[in-house]
Amino acid sequence: MIQSNLNMEKQDLLICSNLKPNQLPKLLDEALSVAAEGETRDMLLLSLLTNCAYALPAMRMLHGRPHHIYSPELLTMIVAPAASGKGIMNYGRLLLQAIEGNTGKKVYIPANSSASALLKMMDKYDGRGVVFATEMDTLTQTLRAAYGQFGDIVRCIFEHETVSQLRRQNNEFIEIRNPRIAMLL
């Protein structure tokens, strides 16, 4: 079971590993067949859901008062010790390899990208992509480095707020309206 920081009883948490066959779409059921029960299955399901969002470019939903329009990209962090099976998340990437191959567009954005590289990739691919790393350290070390300080960009991505950058050297202006980036760490 994925741990929660909320004060909830164990029985109140969604335990993905207890899902019965046919409770999920067939694609997800079949993809989960490679995982053992328990936490490994939970991690794979979260990876699949985070990656699936990229394949739903036209999906939007209203949430909150006043209503805000959101898309289904998830920002997912799985916290677990080393050698705990987080590598199973790589199977979620298989869902999108066909999209990368057929369109020529890069889906995945390296978690150790600089802030400028992140914005350039977002600009090149219409504000869409998936930041993926099986180790959260990849991103946290990048955020601490001078070149990778893009915590503000991640917060804007979460709310689908416009992100922009102006570089004096080349008079380069980048603006991404309604960024739709999923993150899996």
Feature names for model-found ranges:
Residues 1-185:
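Phosphate-handling catalytic cores of nucleic-acid transaction enzymes
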